[in-house]
Amino acid sequence: ADDYYGREAFKQIYDYLSVHEDNDKYQYAMVGYQLKNTLTENGSVARGVCDIDSNGKLVSVTEHTTIVKRGENAAYTEDDGKSYTDLSGDTIVSMNLWGFSKGFLSEIAYGFRDFLQEGLQHNPLKCEYYLPSVVSRLLDSNKAEVKVLLTTEKWYGVTYKEDKPMVMAAVKKLEENDFYPKQLCGKLEAAANFCFEGVYKEEIPWGNGHINDTYRVTFENEQ
């Protein structure tokens, strides 16, 4: 919810899924970002570095959990900072913006039992069923192809609390340049997306959200 992927990136996913259907393999897509457009000045980040074949298809994603910004480029460490390996800022990484056909839900369900058995045994409190692990399984078994849709969009996210002012300024600039309206929807329009019963009564400010303001909306049951 705190990721901004860029408007063009969503269009790329939509356009791809609109004209591609599964054949003997699942036909998926993933937006690939330039690493330099996904980094923060405030600490290290985890990114999935993509291996892409000559046809623009994803071969694999290698997760590096400690990547730091170095000018327009970056470097990662796997030994708690004792040594670093350089990475070009143009390296393509996954930010988990995927496009799937509906059959992917069945594949998620298929692997969940094995994940749960292993996770509960080895790390019951923190085990996570990572979406890319399902993609990797399908690639390894030759059941899927993933087209990498390259973008120069800048990704914004709040990895560290110090990132928040920069992200807010970036969103404000998008508004000023008319990429988005200053108010995406009214409070009542937002409330209409939820299944509230009754008659709208009022809304009042309710603290500050992570990026956006939050409100408490009150509805009364009809008598």
What residues fall within each predicted segment?
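The conserved acidic donor/metal-binding loop of glycosyltransferases
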Residues: 1-4
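Conserved NTP-binding catalytic cores of kinases and kinase-like/nucleotidyltransferase enzymes
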Residues: 183-223
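Conserved beta-strand termini and adjacent loop/short-helix elements that scaffold enzyme active sites
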Residues: 31, 149-151, 206
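Short acidic-glycine loop/turn motifs at beta-strand connectors
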Residues: 52-57, 152, 218-222
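A structural signal for short hydrophobic beta-strand segments in well-ordered beta-sheet cores
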Residues: 50-52, 148, 214
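Short linear motifs in intrinsically disordered
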Residues: 37-42, 137, 204-207
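Conserved core of the sugar-phosphate nucleotidyltransferase
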Residues: 6-97
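Conserved alpha/beta core of the MobA/IspD/sugar-nucleotide pyrophosphorylase nucleotidyltransferase superfamily
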Residues: 54, 61-186
